[in-house]
Amino acid sequence: MSYSSHILGYSYIIKGDTFIMNTKIDISKNMATQNSNFPILAVSNRHLAAHPFLDQIERVCQAHPAALILREKDLPAEDYKTLATRVLPICQHYNVSCILHTFWQDALALGCTCIHLPLPLLRSLAGADETALEKLAGFSVIGTSVHSVDEALEAERLGATYVAAGHIYVTDCKKGLAPRGLKFLQTVCKSVSLPVYGIGGIKFDPAQWQELESAGAAGGCIMSGMMEL
């Protein structure tokens, strides 16, 4: 079985800085994503990038994942915002939805209505003042990461529109920690009405994607493989 990702459908226009890279690369040998409907979310990690980071982002976008999560949450807020102003136009150029991470005020300031929030942050915002709640209502996509059924149910109550559940397979990102596995993923998928994306140890492997799909996942997230393109 062969696979390709599709676009989530959320888009926006960034005015002003229109930094676009023009690297021409052959990614076909790296991607098992041609001609299918199983969505793959690319997750960034500049520490793993095989090329200069913006160059790497363009390589990822040329592969046309369903979306790119700009995860660089260890950056200071101002540095993250600066990076986002560079990444968003690249995503727009390739018609790839960009989901910003953690810094929701900056996302709104940049006109991006897709955000991924750590669950503790989503929890605190949901219990915050009315102004914060009104601002969160400006997002069309609100994702969060979960590691249990209870967390998935909580995320749904708090207004998340998707969850990333993991880690599903063995991964270097979670060294020494046993994967939660496909049974866990299946249970999460059955427990919530939200789209659930598997994360952790996911590769460009159609057989693996079939396992995720059979467990009920709406798609999968790939970090390391995307940063190695």
Model segments located where?
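Conserved N-terminal beta1-alpha1 strand-loop-helix module at the mouth
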Residues: Y10-L122, L136-T161, K203-P206, M227-L229
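Charged helix-capping and loop-helix junction motifs
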Residues: K81-T85, L177-L185
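Glycine-rich adenosine-cofactor-binding loop
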Residues: G181, V196-D205
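Short amphipathic alpha-helix with an adjacent loop that forms part of the alpha/beta core around
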Residues: T131-E134
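Glycine-rich phosphate-binding active-site loops on the catalytic face of alpha/beta enzymes
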Residues: L119-G127, A164-G176, F204, W209-L229
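Serine residues within intrinsically disordered or low-complexity segments
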Residues: S2-S5, S11
